[in-house]
Amino acid sequence: METNFLRGNPSISQKVGKDNVFRNFYGDTIVFALDDIVKEKLAEYVELLYQSAPECFCERLVPHTFHVTLHDLSNAPVLRDVAEELFENELKVIEKREEIQKQENEIIKMKSKYIFNMVDTSLVLRLYPVDEGEYRRLMDLYSLFDTVKKLSYPFTPHITLAHYDRNRNA
């Protein structure tokens, strides 16, 4: 009997080709930008990952793309498959413009203690707010975008460090 639990999540093929190079991927994910110093430190962590286990990962993420994911509104590997939804989401976000602008320049302080496997597609740095006040601010902002499109999975603040090798254990 063959088991598939070591084969990884097949959804990785939406973002990573058979050659382990990133494919085009379209969407309107809501993200927080990171300071350059944070991106530099993350790049050091990623370097250690690739030195320690290069066979585990696909092409490296470029450090300037590191970000904190707040909400994945819509995404797909083919633009025409998601274009209408992107447009509809944009209209809904425009309707919430004033609410969003109230929080636009605020900084939400976060911490991290560990790296973990995110749905068997990637290795991520798990984040959490430093206190209850920051938690409330984060969840208020998340809830605002969740009214644009409700997600079917729990909110997990994170920074993606590396995507797994698409062909591992194939």
PLM-predicted stretches and their roles:
Residues M1-A170:
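Histidine-dependent nucleotide/RNA phosphoesterase domain, centered on the 2H-phosphoesterase fold
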